[in-house]
A protein has these predicted regions:
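Structural loop-to-beta junction motif characteristic of Rossmann-like glycosyltransferase folds
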Residues: 11-12, 149-150, 167-175, 196
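Acidic donor-binding loop of glycosyltransferase active sites
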Residues: 134, 146-161, 168-169
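A short, well-ordered alpha-helix in the C-terminal region of glycosyltransferases
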Residues: 222-234
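C-terminal alpha-helical cap of glycosyltransferases
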Residues: 233-251
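Short alpha-helical segment that forms part of, or immediately flanks, the ligand-binding pocket
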Residues: 4, 142, 160-168, 189
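Active-site-proximal region of nucleotide-activated glycan assembly enzymes
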Residues: 7-68
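Alpha-helix C-terminal capping/helix-to-coil transition sites in glycosyltransferase folds
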Residues: 31-32, 143-147, 165
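Donor-nucleotide binding loops and adjacent catalytic segments primarily
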Residues: 68-70, 76-151, 185-188, 193, ...
Length: 251
């Protein structure tokens, strides 16, 4: 309704498509929109020529201000590299199971911070050295991201754009098509194609595929970082503000 009202009042409209394929709301709003902001190069070609701009997603400023020292209160007592597992706000049963089944082997080489989702704590692991688990965190996330050497995550658009902006080597495990419209799969494949991420399909997640992915990303982390550094999608807020100012000035 806001978009249609704005258009009827001759007010320019900018919409943002986070996922690689347009959702229903943006499809309906497209005829009324002056510009469409996109996260993925592939998305731009799905809109009329000249309508879409690859801007990326505005990133919360606090994520850039994380301090690894502040996250040391996780209780780690050695200098092992850190893996941060992020299963989304509600967690991921599939990822939680894979991590916990392999936790002893993981802890031989890494310290592990596991964000497992509400109600998903496993108290049998509470005293395991090098492993900390939380249902969910908010203000501490920036510091934990600063501490992490490698991130294992779902492939929601905002989450992966944050990993790109922070230059964090990552393994993406997108929601399966059976549990979603497939947008995370396409998001992940775009990042894989660009060289930003290693992708494991949810249905292919196993001990073997998990450790193969960890070995690849950790052993080649500098290559992943350098590839992400070539992306210009780190200052999306300024790009979008510039677009707004242009439309207002040319109204």
């Amino acid at each position: 309704p806001v978009v249609f009202a704005a258009k009827s009042c001759n007010i320019p409209v900018i919409i943002h498509e986070s996922d690689m394929t347009p959702g229903l709301a943006n499809k309906l709003e497209l005829p009324k929109a002056s510009r469409v902001c996109c996260n993925f190069p592939e998305t731009k070609d799905m809109f009329p020529e000249g309508k879409a701009v690859v801007t990326g997603t505005p990133i919360r400023k606090e994520l850039f201000n994380g301090n690894a020292v502040d996250a040391i209160n996780c209780g780690f007592t050695d200098n092992k590299p850190v893996i941060l597992i992020v299963g989304g706000s509600s967690g991921s049963a599939v990822i939680n199971k894979a991590i916990r089944e392999n936790i002893d082997k993981l802890l031989e080489r890494f310290n592990v911070i596991h964000l497992c989702g509400k109600g998903n704590l496993d108290h049998s692991l509470d005293n395991k050295s090098g492993y900390v688990q939380y249902e969910y965190i908010k203000k501490e996330l920036s510091s934990m991201l600063a501490l992490a050497d490698l991130v294992i995550s779902r492939a929601g658009a905002n989450a992966i754009c944050e990993l790109l902006a922070l230059r964090k080597p990552n393994i993406l495990i997108p929601l399966s098509a059976a549990a979603s419209r497939g947008d995370q799969i396409l998001n992940a494949e775009s990042f894989k194609k660009s060289g930003y991420s290693y992708v494991i399909k949810e249905e292919e997640l196993s001990s073997e595929t998990l450790f193969a992915a960890i070995d690849d990303v950790y052993n080649n982390k500098q290559t992943y970082i350098e590839t992400m550094e070539k992306s210009n999608l780190t200052d999306s807020t300024s790009i979008i503000i510039g677009m707004i100012e242009e439309l207002v000035n040319n109204k």
